[in-house]
A protein has these predicted regions:
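Bergerat-fold GHKL/Histidine-kinase-like ATPase
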Residues: 1-229
């Protein structure tokens, strides 16, 4: 990984996602298959894939093989992230929060905004990726997932472009918001949208926002149809 990249991500708001199979794999993955599993399951709906699979090897990105994992990283424009797939099937990713890296970030008070629609899209991508790993056979028995957003203390939700603004403050005093789930066979059959919905309901509750599930589903449906606000 590029020197200092993880420290830069940790210095601002960022997502940390961990997934692992519910049951140990019958056979450990080869390093090549670690890369191929991520490559095959990545989610590319809004123009930038999660996890991002890059093929360059320079100051803006690269791939490295460790003793029992493959990792891929990116440091380009607003996209600062890395992922790691272990031979055990455990997946880890760190992604800088777009609210802290976009073109307007320097004009805002650092670490104070969280776009609710972007959260819906991101969490849905995380669960879609996990479900694809399951569908492809890696997590055939289901998987455990931890979705964490670090750097949330004092951060307030904003509704997002084209949405009705919140009438009152929606914020949290917690430094980190983390939601954990075990996705069993019934959850796999219900689909990624339903898995993500449960995570979103719990996540937004930390900010004092408790929308009807139908409102969140509508945003998810628009996401899958690529009708971005």
């Amino acid at each position: 990984m590029k020197e200092g990249l993880l420290e830069r991500i940790r210095a601002i708001g960022h997502w940390r996602v961990v997934m692992r199979p519910r049951s140990p794999l019958a056979e450990r993955l080869t390093l090549q298959r670690c890369f191929e599993e991520v490559e095959r399951a990545r989610v590319s709906i809004r123009g930038w894939d999660y996890p991002h699979v890059g093929y360059r090897n320079d100051e803006q990105g690269g791939t490295e093989r460790g003793g029992d994992f493959v990792e891929n990283w990116c440091d380009w424009n607003t996209q600062i992230e890395f992922w790691r797939m272990h031979r055990s099937g455990q997946f880890l990713s760190y992604s800088a929060l777009y609210d802290d890296t976009d073109a307007l970030a320097e004009q805002r008070e650092p670490g104070r905004q969280l776009n609710a629609v972007d959260v819906i899209y991101s969490v849905t991508e995380f669960l879609e990726f996990g479900h694809r790993l399951a569908q492809n056979g890696l997590y055939a028995d289901g998987f455990q997932i931890s979705v964490g957003l670090i750097g949330t203390q004092g951060r307030r939700l904003v509704a997002g472009r084209g949405r009705m603004p919140f009438m009152d403050d929606k914020s949290t005093a917690a430094a980190k918001v983390e939601v954990e789930r075990i996705i069993e066979m019934a959850g796999l059959e219900a689909g990624a949208t339903e898995s993500a919905l449960g995570v979103l309901v719990e996540f937004f509750d930390h900010f004092g926002w408790n929308p009807a599930e139908g409102q969140l589903r509508a945003e998810q449906d628009a996401f899958y149809r690529r009708q971005f606000g």
